[in-house]
């Protein structure tokens, strides 16, 4: 029997770089919110202990794919603690809608969905805290997708506080380029000393993204798309890019702007949600 599981996108509603540690990692403050839009992961259980990804990603080796790594990590962790039945395996496929290198968290979301789904299907019984701890070894953003609630994150992105920002509508646009995160974080002109503020203060301020100035300067495509969106609504970069988003109070407003978009603009309309569609599907 095949089951389907949502793997939603996320937006960074704001992102501030507050410093850089001696080990090179940047400290930050950011606000994560999910979208009711994303990839769909299909899982069919096997009884031979094998993990097979039926929809490989071009340019990514099977064992390097975050989906496979997440499945194998859960398999080992559960087996080592005696919580995995002998022969547990899975065929996994993905209907991919989220772009790679877009700042929407696609790979991290995929890994989190696999952890949560296989924990349920294999009846491992691991807690969300245990799954989130495992997820952190796969990527800094994986835990927020595992926990499934909009969150304020700080530290190097590993300290989470659940929050409930307004659930607005967004027009999300992809400029057609992929921006590797290190390109932004290694840029010498990246702001690295934004003052730390409390959650309460940040939620009252106008939101912005410290990475945006670098993305716009280094990638003309980002600047062009963002300039167009800013003519219609408050707009900014998500994560380290490349995707940008415009914020609206209603779905109809967002769709009206999308209908006016030039042919070269690749975008979609989605609602921001504080409870992940993955966790909503499990209720």
Swiss-Prot record:
EC number(s) per UniProt? 2.7.1.148
- Positions annotated to bind ATP: 99-109
One GO BP annotation is:
terpenoid biosynthetic process
The record's catalysed reaction(s) read: 4-CDP-2-C-methyl-D-erythritol + ATP = 4-CDP-2-C-methyl-D-erythritol 2-phosphate + ADP + H(+)
Which Pfam family would be a valid example here? GHMP_kinases_C
* Pathway note: Isoprenoid biosynthesis; isopentenyl diphosphate biosynthesis via DXP pathway; isopentenyl diphosphate from 1-deoxy-D-xylulose 5-phosphate: step 3/6
Molecular function via GO: 4-(cytidine 5'-diphospho)-2-C-methyl-D-erythritol kinase activity; ATP binding
- UniProtKB keywords: ATP-binding, Isoprene biosynthesis, Kinase, Nucleotide-binding, Transferase
Residues of the active site are: 10, 141
Q: Which InterPro entries match?
A: GHMP_kinase_C_dom, GHMP_kinase_C_sf, GHMP_kinase_N_dom, IspE, Ribosomal_Su5_D2-typ_SF, Ribsml_uS5_D2-typ_fold_subgr
| Signal peptide bounds | none
The organism's place on the tree of life at top rank: Bacteria
Report quaternary structure and partners: Homodimer.
- Family designation: Belongs to the GHMP kinase family. IspE subfamily.
Tell me which NCBIfam families the record gives. ispE (TIGR00154)
Give a short account of what the protein does. Answer: Catalyzes the phosphorylation of the position 2 hydroxy group of 4-diphosphocytidyl-2C-methyl-D-erythritol.
Protein name as catalogued: 4-diphosphocytidyl-2-C-methyl-D-erythritol kinase
């Amino acid at each position: 029997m095949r089951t389907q599981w949502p793997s939603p996108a996320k937006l960074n509603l704001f992102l501030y770089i507050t410093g850089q540690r001696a080990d090179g990692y940047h400290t930050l403050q950011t606000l994560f919110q999910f979208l009711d839009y994303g990839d769909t992961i299909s899982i069919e259980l096997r009884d031979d202990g094998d993990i097979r990804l039926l929809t490989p990603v071009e340019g990514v080796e099977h064992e390097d794919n975050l989906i496979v790594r997440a499945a194998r990590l859960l398999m080992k962790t559960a087996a080592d603690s005696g919580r995995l039945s002998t022969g547990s395996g899975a065929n996994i496929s993905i209907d991919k809608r989220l772009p790679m290198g877009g700042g929407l968290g696609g790979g991290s979301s995929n890994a989190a969905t696999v952890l949560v789904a296989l924990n349920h299907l294999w009846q491992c019984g691991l807690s969300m805290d245990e799954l989130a701890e495992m997820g952190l070894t796969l990527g800094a953003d994986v835990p927020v997708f595992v926990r499934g609630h909009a969150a304020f994150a700080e530290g190097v992105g590993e300290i989470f506080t659940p929050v409930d920002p307004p659930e607005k509508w967004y027009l999300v646009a992809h400029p057609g380029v992929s921006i590797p995160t290190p390109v932004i974080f290694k840029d010498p002109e990246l702001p690295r000393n934004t003052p730390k503020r409390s959650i309460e203060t940040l939620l009252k301020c106008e939101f912005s993204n410290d990475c945006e100035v670098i993305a716009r300067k280094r990638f003309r495509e980002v600047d062009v798309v963002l300039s167009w969106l800013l003519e219609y609504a408050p707009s900014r970069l998500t994560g380290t890019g490349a995707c940008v988003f415009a914020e609206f109070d209603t779905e109809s407003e967002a769709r009206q702007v999308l209908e006016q978009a030039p042919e070269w603009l690749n975008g979609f309309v989605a609602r921001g949600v504080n409870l992940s569609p993955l966790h909503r599907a499990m209720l």
